[in-house]
Amino acid sequence: MVLRHTEHKKKQKMKKHKRLAIVNGGMKFYALAVMALTALTACTNDGVGEVINHETAEVRMTFTPYEMEPMTRANSASGLTRTDGVTRAAVADYATRLDVWIYDGDTEVQAVHQQSTDEGFASLSVRLEKAKTYTVYACAHKAVGAATLSNGVVSWPDDKVTHSFFYSQTFSPATTTTLSCLMERIVGNFRLEVTDKVPEGVARMTVDMGDSPTRWDVGGFGVNAVSRVSSFTPAVGSSPTLSVFVITDGEEAEIYDITVTAYDGEDAVVQQRVFEDVPIRAGYRSTYRGEFFTEAIFSMSFTVSDWMDYETVDF
């Protein structure tokens, strides 16, 4: 009887130890779960539950369209006094749309399309992987719709060229989280200022640039050269100004022969003038000013605005 009682006590102790082991194991599991939950909570942003991946970084970008230099600085090579005044213009002053594309190699990661009426126009934030290297491409312009980027070429609706700027930069979020993107003009401007009055019977005027690029290769040059004719409808009795933007690249001016024609309602020619050897260069404006409808001799002079004006011709 004593032996059986002793064995019974041993069995009870073994059962008790098992229960303690189960309880202790459960407490350890609970403690691990609490630690994991605490660690997860520590990785949230301001307690709102958004988990931050420490393998990524937020990259902020702001865009300005170009750096404006006084004429004396822009032309210091020609003997004018150099000055140091430099200002930057806002994108919204010169563009109504901003299109941004972010690429990982040849793969588009993200595209952002903004309009000047959007809050925060010309600025954005994106979250990208730290371990990768990206390239950002951006185009500011005044086209009626968003630009597209395909196979390294930027194009606009109907291939219509407007006042346009471009920017590209390769960066790594591991070392760069802020980009101040100074955009450059990729167009030159031909401007015709008519000083006499549009006579009765004139229904429209056209500016024929001949063949010129209508798209922009991100490598830094214009492509898709086609014949471009821009049409305008001036009011009778007005002195119109006709303005055409031309995609150009490089440091040298492209030379164009530009034909301007006035038509009546039956598409008969009322007046036509050909402007030969017109220099068109990115960031520069070539202005011709004078009487168009009378038989006047054309002369040339150039004015300066925010563009680094190439030359102005009085005719």
Which ranges hold each PLM region?
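Tryptophan-paired
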Residues: G85-L149, G201-A282, T312-F315
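Short, Lys/Arg-enriched N-terminal segments with co-localized hydrophobic residues
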Residues: M1-K13
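Bacterial N-terminal signal peptides that target proteins for export
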Residues: K15-A31
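Conserved "repeat-terminator" motif of extracellular CCP/Sushi domains
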Residues: S180-V187, V246-E251
